């Protein structure tokens, strides 16, 4: 079966051309071609009051106005994340040279008095081109708006040199230097030098010098001192001579107004005198193990319960609680922490007593507010800390070889230096020829000495003072080129090897069904080797 060919339908314009003359055009075709549809009429009436310019919003062509449509994401502007487009002016084509032009002179009028005979002359045409003027335009690269200082050129008369005035690239700016010093109260440098005139022992030193180093010309020094004015110096108070009274810091990170706290439902439930019984507890178990105050039971010390506790008991039996204040307590809430008007921390628990039980099984009892106020933590007296090896007074330098002690010894009384001896021997009992008088009874202490081994006599000696420190180890280096005796300390212990019996590690099983055990081949008795005759 062959499919019939589809005939192309006539357009609206072709139908309008054929039916307009006969007057048989449909209304929709006439409105479409003559632009009399409802949409066209709305635009016609609206354009009388509103002008949209050349936007092209009509039934005309969709050209987008004079500039045309701009696709989304494109345009002459700067794209997001891209390089800005630099707009450069168009380049004018350069003219290499003028074209060959033949100059033509204008026709001059003939003078009537001139002769009628015209002398012929050879006239040549100048076909050579004139001076060629070359014009080349260089378009500068567009730059940012920057201020450029242009030098000023001053020209004088003929024969004089030009003066070039170069201005500064930027005018000098006024600068101001400020210094601020902050003192750290947690760090204080303590000086050990002897305080001089006008110097304090703290970190803030004030040094006052008198002008005594110069020379006075033209008069005695007394006249200068008499005419000068003496300024009485006042002592500035140290920054540690006063105390800063700071306000009381807040007790909580987010303080709550007392009016809002007093209106809370929890506070009304705890401190309602008409509905809640107030009981002050003095037993410390109320803070950690309140269940031990209600009934005798075993508590797990590793478990801290901060939830509501319910105690079940048989009302037919009378049980005495460990604490009389917790009699008939059936329910005890979790701990609540509040603040008293005196500023103490109060631990509260809201409980309910099961005093009466009805026939229906309902238990009736009053609410009880158990509370305990925590005591004040007394502030311990501060302990004055002593600095180790430092002090703020005068420093004392002790030089042993320089200092000497003079001891007045009487020859007649050689034993007078002995401490605790009251009697003085007579001259007859003293042997002046004895060598015991020359003995030095001083005890030498070599606990802090150092042994130096060397043969050079030109070795420089560096004396290092020794200070008392809490550490026991001290390292003294006398000279880099000298000899140093080091005694290394070894703490390696010798491993003790315990003897073990020589038992083979390989066990050989023997298929022996005669017994329920087996012997190692090394434990079996060796058989004697017999010679056969």
Swiss-Prot record:
Tagged with keyword Zinc-finger: no
> What family does this chain come from, according to its entry?
Belongs to the papillomaviridae L2 protein family.
Q: According to the UniProt record, which cysteines are disulfide-bonded?
A: 19-25
List the ranges annotated as motif Nuclear localization signal: 1-10, 525-532
Supply one GO BP term: microtubule-dependent intracellular transport of viral material towards nucleus
What job does this protein perform?
Minor protein of the capsid that localizes along the inner surface of the virion, within the central cavities beneath the L1 pentamers. Plays a role in capsid stabilization through interaction with the major capsid protein L1. Once the virion enters the host cell, L2 escorts the genomic DNA into the nucleus by promoting escape from the endosomal compartments and traffic through the host Golgi network.
Question: What name appears for this protein in its UniProt entry?
Answer: Minor capsid protein L2
Q: What is its main location?
A: virion
**Where found, per UniProt?**
Virion; Host nucleus; Host early endosome; Host Golgi apparatus
Alphabetized, the UniProt keywords read: Capsid protein, Cytoplasmic inwards viral transport, Disulfide bond, DNA-binding, Host endosome, Host Golgi apparatus, Host nucleus, Host-virus interaction, Late protein, Microtubular inwards viral transport, Phosphoprotein, Viral penetration into host nucleus, Virion, Virus entry into host cell
MF (Gene Ontology): DNA binding; structural molecule activity
Q: Which domain of life is it from?
A: Viruses
PTM note? Highly phosphorylated.
Quaternary data: Interacts with major capsid protein L1. Interacts with E2; this interaction inhibits E2 transcriptional activity but not the DNA replication function E2. Interacts with host GADD45GIP1. Interacts with host HSPA8; this interaction is required for L2 nuclear translocation. Interacts with host importins KPNB2 and KPNB3. Forms a complex with importin alpha2-beta1 heterodimers via interaction with the importin alpha2 adapter. Interacts with host DYNLT1; this interaction is essential for virus intracellular transport during entry.
Q: Name one GO cellular component term.
A: host cell endosome
Which intervals of the chain form a coiled coil? none
């Amino acid at each position: 079966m062959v499919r019939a060919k589809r005939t192309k339908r006539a357009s609206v314009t072709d139908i309008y051309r054929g039916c307009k003359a006969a007057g048989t055009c449909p209304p929709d075709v006439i409105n479409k071609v003559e632009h009399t549809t409802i949409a066209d009429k709305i635009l016609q009436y609206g354009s009388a009051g509103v002008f949209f310019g050349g936007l092209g919003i009509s039934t005309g062509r969709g050209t987008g106005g004079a500039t045309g449509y701009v696709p989304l994401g494109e345009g002459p502007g700067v794209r997001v994340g891209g390089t800005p487009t630099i707009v450069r002016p168009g380049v004018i084509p350069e003219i290499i040279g003028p074209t060959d032009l033949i100059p033509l002179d204008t026709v001059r009028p003939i003078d009537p008095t001139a002769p009628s005979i015209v002398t012929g002359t050879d006239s040549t045409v100048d076909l050579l081109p004139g001076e060629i003027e070359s014009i080349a335009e260089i378009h500068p690269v567009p730059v940012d708006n920057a201020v450029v200082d242009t030098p000023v050129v001053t020209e004088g008369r003929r024969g004089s040199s030009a003066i070039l005035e170069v201005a500064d690239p930027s005018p000098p700016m006024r600068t101001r230097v400020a210094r601020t010093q902050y003192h750290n109260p947690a760090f204080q440098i303590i000086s050990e030098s002897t305080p001089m005139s006008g110097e304090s022992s703290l970190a803030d030193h004030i040094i006052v010098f008198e002008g005594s180093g110069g020379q006075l010309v033209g008069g005695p020094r007394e006249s200068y001192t008499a005419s000068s004015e003496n300024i009485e110096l006042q002592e500035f108070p140290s920054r540690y001579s006063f105390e800063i009274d700071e306000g009381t810091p807040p007790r909580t990170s987010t303080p709550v107004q007392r009016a809002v706290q007093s209106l809370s439902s929890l506070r009304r439930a705890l401190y309602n005198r008409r509905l809640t019984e107030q009981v002050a507890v003095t037993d410390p178990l109320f803070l950690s193990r309140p269940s031990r105050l209600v009934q005798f039971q075993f508590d797990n010390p590793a478990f801290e319960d901060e939830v509501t506790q319910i105690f079940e008991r048989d009302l037919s039996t009378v049980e005495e609680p460990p604490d009389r204040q917790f009699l008939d307590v059936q329910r005890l809430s979790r701990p609540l922490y509040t603040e008293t008007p005196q500023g103490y921390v109060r631990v509260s628990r809201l409980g309910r007593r099961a005093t009466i039980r009805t026939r229906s099984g309902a238990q009736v009892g009053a609410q009880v507010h158990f509370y305990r106020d925590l005591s004040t933590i007394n502030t311990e007296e501060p302990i004055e800390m002593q600095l180790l090896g430092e002090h703020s007074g005068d420093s004392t330098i002790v030089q042993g070889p320089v200092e000497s002690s003079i001891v007045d010894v009487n020859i007649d009384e050689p034993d007078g230096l002995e401490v605790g001896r009251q009697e003085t021997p007579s001259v007859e009992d003293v042997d002046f020829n004895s060598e015991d008088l020359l003995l030095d009874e001083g005890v030498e202490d070599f606990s802090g000495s150092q042994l130096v081994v060397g043969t050079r006599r030109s070795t420089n000696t560096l004396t290092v003072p020794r200070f008392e420190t809490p550490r026991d180890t001290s390292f003294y280096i006398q000279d880099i080129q000298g000899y140093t005796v080091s005694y290394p300390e070894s703490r390696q212990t010798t491993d003790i090897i315990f003897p073990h019996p020589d038992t083979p590690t390989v066990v050989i099983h023997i298929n022996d069904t005669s017994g329920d055990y087996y012997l190692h081949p090394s434990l079996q008795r060796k058989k004697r080797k017999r010679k056969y005759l």
